Regions:
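A short, polar beta-strand/turn micro-motif
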Residues: 1-35, 43, 79-158, 208-237
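Fold-core signature of tandem repeat domains
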Residues: 39-41, 50, 90, 167-170, ...
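Intrinsically disordered, low-complexity segments enriched in Gly and acidic/Ser/Thr residues
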Residues: 127, 131-201
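Ser/Thr/Pro-rich low-complexity tandem-repeat tracts
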Residues: 25, 35-36, 45-48, 164, ...
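A cross-kingdom feature marking solvent-exposed beta-strand/loop segments within repeated
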Residues: 46-84, 174-212
């Protein structure tokens, strides 16, 4: 899962699918979704799948490539866009020769960015090209600062993963799941919240960081209100 951490250089909030990856030399192009690199975009309820279509020479109708196409309309070069601050899946076919170095470029705003989160799963990312600590805390000799004030932004805190906001980060083979833990007053051991904790080690405030360039799932429990997460810019004046 990768992130759209830059704005287009013209200052707009959306980037064309065709322009998302500037260096296309490492992309795998094919004539089906299964043989091509894919970009998968979540809209809150379903994925839209795009694949990098090669030029098909046996039918003039399909002399459109290589370019990105919607898997449901593969004869037409897509004009769809993705919003800055989103996360997307980038999927490679199993036959791909090697890892690709994906480069996304643009401008960095000095203004804060607002992430809208709804009940259910939201695919988002840091809106800026920097690491994003989940908690502000001291780690050894380093003070790491989270760019989001979770309390003022209304993050949903609970004492189980199912009753709390979650952040789920994919490492290439599995998800690391974190949830926003509330203060638990019945046991002094757990007077740690509200803060983000690893679901596998929920008694300890996590030093976890979402790496620059990586998207993630932000899951809000059903029945809770939608909200806005305000992320500070690293170059704010």
């Amino acid at each position: 899962m990768i992130s759209l951490s830059f704005q287009p250089v013209d200052g707009t909030e959306e980037i064309a699918i065709q322009d998302l990856i500037q260096d296309k030399s490492q992309l795998v192009a094919g004539n089906t979704a299964g043989t091509s690199d894919q970009i998968q975009v979540w809209d809150g309820s379903k994925f839209t799948v795009y694949f990098y279509r090669a030029k098909k020479t046996t039918n003039p109708k399909f002399l459109i490539g290589p370019c990105w196409v919607d898997a449901n309309n593969a004869g037409v070069k897509t004009l769809d866009t993705i919003k800055h601050g989103a996360g997307v899946w980038f999927a490679r076919p199993s036959s791909a020769p090697a890892q690709a170095q994906i480069t996304i470029s643009g401008s960095v705003s000095a203004l804060p960015f607002n992430h809208t989160v709804n009940p259910g799963f939201n695919m988002i990312a840091s809106a800026f090209p920097v690491d994003m600590p989940l908690n502000t805390m001291q780690v050894g000799d380093v003070t790491q600062t989270c760019p989001i004030d979770w309390v003022s932004c209304g993050a949903v805190a609970g004492n189980t993963a199912g009753t709390s906001d979650q952040i789920q980060v994919w490492d290439g083979s599995k998800f690391s799941v974190y949830f926003y833990r509330a203060k638990k007053t019945t046991n002094p051991k757990f007077l740690i919240g509200p803060c983000w904790v690893d679901a596998n080690n929920a008694g300890v405030k996590t030093p976890a960081i979402v790496p620059a360039g990586k998207g993630f799932w932000y899951a809000r429990p059903d029945g809770k209100d939608a909200g806005t997460l305000i992320q500070a810019s690293p170059i704010a004046q």
